[in-house]
Amino acid sequence: MRTVVIAGGTRGIGGALAARLRAAGDRVIALGSADADLTSVRETAELVGGRLPDRIDALVLAAGRFDMRRVVTAEGLEQTFAIGVVSRYLLAERLRPALAAAARPVVLNLSGTGGIKAGRIHWDDPQLTRGYTMFKATMQGARANDLLGVAFAARESRVRYILYNPLLVNSGMHRQFRQPMRTLVGAAATVAGATVDGAAKPLVTLLDNPPDAPLTALRRGKRVSLSRQEFDTATATRFEALLKGVIAAV
């Protein structure tokens, strides 16, 4: 029996994936907001330190939070950055020993996976204290997670890291928008988007048979070349250093 930890595993794609894995007989630890405050560096560290098993076969990073307003956590971090970037980094890095104890360990990060021209790292203001928009925060997070995958895979490890963008999914995210965008995005998701269960199905296959490469990027199942500038190793190293500074300051 595999042990799978899913951050963001109580609703949306993560919840649908959790249901599929449980039905297949896997032990699933689904982390939602009631289980741990993943916007908090301290709570995330405590979660890793004492509440998760010593062997984890798969770690799925699907937690995220979006808000039209800039929300600051109790630790002074912008909320989207805290849960969508910082917590994912902490979980993957600090669970390395538990993952290494498994036979075929894999990290699956639902991320941007390159090609998002609007996504960029705001090096001088990663907390977006100036000119915050939900779109800007979300796109920075997508870009950041691609870099986290590069940084993780750069260190020799048996753990396979998969970056996966399911593209348009009818997950209800459109409810975060103001009108008329809420109606437009909701209609597009209903017509063209995959259901959360449909989006979860290929993820099961990836967890069952992870690629052999240390890092793989996929956009709705189609491979994305890691030679793209979005996966630049030097940029990933620079971003990880920035992130360590943010965490150390908390």
Kindly label every feature range from the protein language model:
Residues 7-20:
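N-terminal Rossmann NAD(P)H-binding glycine-rich loop of SDR-like oxidoreductase domains
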Residues 42-55:
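Conserved amphipathic alpha-helix within the SDR
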Residues 29-44:
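Rossmann-fold cofactor-recognition segment
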Residues 68-69, 100, 104-158, 165-181:
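Catalytic loop of short-chain dehydrogenase/reductase
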Residues 7, 55-64, 108-111, 162:
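Rossmann-fold scaffold of SDR-type NAD(P)-dependent oxidoreductases
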